[in-house]
Amino acid sequence: MWRNYIDAIDTSSDTSHFWVNGSKDMHISLHKDGLLNTYNIRKLSDDIYEINTIAYYPESAIPGCLVNAIYKVCAMHTAQGWQLMNYFDAIKGLYKQHTLGRIDFYFGNGVVVDKKRMKESANFVELFLDKYNLDYNNRITYLTAGSIDECSAMVGLSYTPMRTHKKYAGRAMGNIILSTRLNHIHEVVHAIMLPLFPSAPLFLHEGIASYYGGMAEQPYKSVKSIARAYVEKEKVDFSNKESLAVSLGNDIQLFNVVGAAIIEYALQQGGESEVIRLFSAANYDQVFELLGVDNSQRANFIRGLFN
């Protein structure tokens, strides 16, 4: 079991055969950098063991930021021998579960089952896939609890630097959604688009999620108005994506809003097919190349999106 675990976390080669059903644990891929220290192995049953690991950096590499994650995966004895499986797959039977459309909802302790909001998310998935003509064969696993930290614990993430107690927070990892809300459309969009377009620029992913799902419990139109006031007042250099690393207050990021404004522009110019074309870009600069905007005109183009 231990030998297979060491081989399975090697990110330099295809390790899917070490995993039950070839499904690699999300948290390994998210926290593959740095060093791994397995500090405990606990028996859950005769066939399943829980493996507890800390992902960390040497202090010389990132001073003051040592622990990247504390997480759990499981090892299961199968006909092929010991294989790894997602922690949630091992313990999901402990949680109340409902299925609507393509979404499997799981509820932490004390969470009210609100079928109206669940239906909003399930219906949005079908409408979005139809609108964009996307070939999406995944099911979405939607975990909800009283806080994001509780949701994270359900999938085996005991700690990440992204811990938060904000009620509107959410997170999508592949086709897994963690949220305190059952109709968190921003994260639903991520759960669809991130697996389909893993190489697309992050600001497009945040843009399309913010365009349809808003951010910080505010719709896109509201945050666009806030960004408009900032863009009109401040002299922002839009020549590179680092210039977008600006907080507009109340957890509204200029990075997300500019991405959403570009999605809006693409829809106006060529509809959903134009949006999908932009997702073929590999970086920030290529997005503007596809839009036909050279670097000297980039700042004026982006400001024009807010007129």
Question: Where do the PLM segments sit?
Answer:
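Extracytoplasmic
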Residues: 46-48, 68-70, 100, 137
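A short hydrophobic beta-strand element
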Residues: 44-57
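Short beta-strand edge/turn micro-motifs at domain boundaries
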Residues: 61-95
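A short, structured loop/turn motif at beta-sheet edges
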Residues: 41-47, 78, 269-272
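Solvent-exposed, polar/charged alpha-helical surfaces in well-ordered, non-transmembrane soluble domains
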Residues: 3, 119-130, 191, 210, ...
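Short solvent-exposed beta->alpha transition segments
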Residues: 2-42, 151
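Juxtacatalytic substrate-recognition/specificity segment
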Residues: 95-201, 290
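Acidic/His/Gly-enriched intrinsically disordered linker/tail segments
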Residues: 175-179, 199-307
